[in-house]
Amino acid sequence: MIVLTGEGERAFCAGGDIKAGADGGPFVQDPADPDHFAGRLFEAIQACRKPTIARINGVAMGAGAGIICACDLAVMADHARIGTPEVKVGLFPMTIVPPMMRVLPRRKLMEMFITGVPLTAEEALKFDLVNYVTDAAGLDEKVAELVAQIAAQSPSAIRLGKYACHAMEDMTYPQQMRFAETLLPRVAQTEDAREGFDAFITKRKPEWTGR
């Protein structure tokens, strides 16, 4: 289980350093390493086999919005805001587009990108950018509740399920179905699946091994 959050209560992730990027230097690609660090970060979060939860304790701007979209779940404090203000300084959130496109409806996404106006917590919940909104005092309690609920489930089922969901995102529906059919026997043959079946039949709590 991985919970991503910011230090303190002001920001989850404030985005890039505008002063440091004033000359455009940070945005120049290294010919020997053309992948942008933000893109690698989002991909790593999405591909992570452990469940990821964004604990949004304050403003999440630019890359912060991308991190939230790359996570599996998100819990947001009601005072927080999520935005992509790059257009206000003559930029566009190029590397943030891919993870956000997978979560937000296109029209709301474009509104955020071309106006630079951030979403309130209420709006983020409405558009499924986050799972839950709480007051600041209840943020840790809600995150802990989710962590406990996930921790009670089979680690191997979650691990294989996350792999499947991530792999199927760019497939056609028939491809998704064929891929799912190949994975179903694999998950059913794990130690956790056998333990889960036996625990259900004998009416006891399963003891997961994660294998």
Positions of PLM-derived features:
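Conserved hydrophobic packing residues within short motifs/helices of P-loop NTPase cores
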Residues: M1-L4, I53
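Helix-loop "lid/cap" segments that line or gate small-molecule binding pockets
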Residues: M112-F113, A164-M168, T182-A188
